[in-house]
Amino acid sequence: MRIGIVAGELSGDQLGATLVEALKKKYPNAEIEGIGGPKMEAQGFKSLYPMDALSLIGFLEILSKGLSILNIRRKIIKYFKHNKPDIFIGIDAPDFNLTVEKKLRASGIKTIHYVSPKIWVWREYRIKKIRKATDKILAILPFEVEYYKNRHNFEAIYVGHPLAKNISLEIDRSKYKKRLGLENVELPILSVLPGSRTTEVTRLLPLFLDAIEKLQESGYKFKAIMPLAKPSLKPIFDQYNSQIRSLGIEVLETNSHDVLKASDLSLLASGTATLEAMLCKLPMVVGYKLSKLSAFIGRILIRGHSYWAFPNILHKSEIIKELIQEDCTVDNLFYELKRLFDDKQRNNYIVQEFKKIHEHMVVDTEEKIIEVLDSIIEKS
């Protein structure tokens, strides 16, 4: 069996790694190739192009590197047309993958899109392309199935999120503190995750650091830890090394999973990390900033959606504070961090609500995906 997969960024690499591992167990001799990151490659995946080349965000970044991405997309389509897989799976990255899927499906290759494009937030017109591009949408958020059915009469299948299955309902924080060498830390631990993309970290890290500095100057005592999401971000961290050191922030060359599981509270960028932090039952403050042009265009295209952070979307209310664009200032971050440290009753409520959401999300994701994959291949 031959399986094609394209994942476009760190979160896609995480999803892809667990999927490739499950596929290898089910089909030991399967050839699985395409575009993926180091976690997928560690499971035996063959990446034809570096995944980092697709990890862009915002309209300015797309304009500056768009030709390179288009060239890779053209080559990957040509490759799979000449080396036809039994099925192709596009993981997230809809602006890249839907075109790949559409071209491959038109040539007779069965396709799956794993992680629904957020058409329930913006650019709903993409449903037309989705219909042409994919045999099945695999949704990782429970409400998406109902959205597709009721609004577009299109079948999406809820497969859960592997993080919901892999993260325990009850977190033994002492275990992860010990793993990170923090077992003797008695202060509250604040994890700081300013993003996984260069543009995110460049915009958010200085704001996060200044807010933490104000918090410390106000007398709050805590231990801050920050994972280095990938080596390519180290030059940005190095620019702020003196401030990071003066604030006593420990930069850990480890994955975000362990850092979040060892934490009591979190300050982080909007994105998949907020879902992970929610599953780790962490009260949090979320910040995010796009370039001015990206934000301007985004507001034109976005469809009246109230929330950016996954916990708020899933809870259908602002259970955690999200500070987006002009609201993402040092003063606002500082104020919300103070609330995070001070309001224990609110934090307890947040933790209990996160547990309820987590319980609802648990599904054997990889088994469900393989079940869908098998049914599609059998029909071909």
From Swiss-Prot:
Keyword Lipid metabolism on entry: yes
Known pathway: Bacterial outer membrane biogenesis; LPS lipid A biosynthesis
Protein name from the UniProt record: Lipid-A-disaccharide synthase
Leader peptide range in chain numbering: none
InterPro entries, alphabetized: Glyco_trans_19 (IPR003835)
Known catalytic reactions: a lipid X + a UDP-2-N,3-O-bis[(3R)-3-hydroxyacyl]-alpha-D-glucosamine = a lipid A disaccharide + UDP + H(+)
Any GO CC annotation of this UniProt entry: membrane
Native source species: Francisella philomiragia subsp. philomiragia (strain ATCC 25017 / CCUG 19701 / FSC 153 / O#319-036)
Pfam families with a match to the protein in the record: LpxB
Top-level taxon: Bacteria
Keyword Protein biosynthesis (UniProt): no
Single Gene Ontology MF annotation: lipid-A-disaccharide synthase activity
